[in-house]
């Protein structure tokens, strides 16, 4: 059989809603794909550090995260690019000026910086 490559989103695809809980049927399907020698990976807009938590829990070693800006293969980060700082600052200024809640992750950590005390309740 020819090796196939399967990429799965987390939120609402592998997991139930925005949780990190995966149905047993999805876990079984992933196990069968891996046993058959196929490549499995997570592809998500989530921060790599957040995706890695899910990946570790469910046996993924390959991750495309940060909306495609980072690539992890066999558990090693091969590529990670951040958005240009000046553009991010301009965008945050625009969000503030328009009263739109925002949060940023300046590092690859499950930590956000925000000026909005209610941000987590909005997410």
Mark where each language-model region is.
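Catalytic-core regions built around general acid/base machinery
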Residues: 24-37, 90, 94
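HAD-like small-molecule phosphatases
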Residues: 69-123
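Charged helix-capping and loop-helix junction motifs
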Residues: 22-25, 84-85
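Glycine-rich loop at the start of a catalytic domain that most often binds anionic cofactors/ligands
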Residues: 52-60, 116-120
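Asp-based phosphoryl-transfer active-site loop
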Residues: 2-19
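Substrate-recognition element of Asp-dependent hydrolases with the DxDx(T/V) motif
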Residues: 30-52, 67, 102-109
